[in-house]
Amino acid sequence: MAKEEVLEFPGVVTELLPNATFRVKLENEHEIIAHTAGRMRKNRIRVLAGDKVLVEMTPYDLTKGRITYRFK
């Protein structure tokens, strides 16, 4: 089964929300709700407000995303 077409955008975490979700402001000034990817949870990578992250989104719902990478 082929993986869906995903869109990746860099952004900055602006707010921490319950249940490992975050409000992320993308570089194109849009704000979305994003949750951490499973590998980030498994490896216990912490995401805090102000962190630069890479967000993966589907073209079907551009208001939600998945945080796949935290820049150092």
Swiss-Prot record:
Superkingdom of origin: Bacteria
GO terms of molecular function: ribosome binding; rRNA binding; translation initiation factor activity
GO cellular component: cytosol
SUPFAM superfamilies (alphabetical): Nucleic acid-binding proteins
PROSITE patterns: S1_IF1_TYPE
Keyword check for Transferase: no
UniProt cross-references to InterPro entries, sorted A to Z: NA-bd_OB-fold, RNA-binding_domain_S1_IF1, TIF_IF1
Keywords, alphabetical: Cytoplasm, Initiation factor, Protein biosynthesis, RNA-binding, rRNA-binding
Subcellular location: Cytoplasm
CDD domains for this protein: S1_IF1 (cd04451)
General function of this protein: One of the essential components for the initiation of protein synthesis. Stabilizes the binding of IF-2 and IF-3 on the 30S subunit to which N-formylmethionyl-tRNA(fMet) subsequently binds. Helps modulate mRNA selection, yielding the 30S pre-initiation complex (PIC). Upon addition of the 50S ribosomal subunit IF-1, IF-2 and IF-3 are released leaving the mature 70S translation initiation complex.
Assembly notes: Component of the 30S ribosomal translation pre-initiation complex which assembles on the 30S ribosome in the order IF-2 and IF-3, IF-1 and N-formylmethionyl-tRNA(fMet); mRNA recruitment can occur at any time during PIC assembly.
Family in the record: Belongs to the IF-1 family.
Full protein name: Translation initiation factor IF-1
Source lineage: Bacteria, Pseudomonadati, Pseudomonadota, Alphaproteobacteria, Hyphomicrobiales
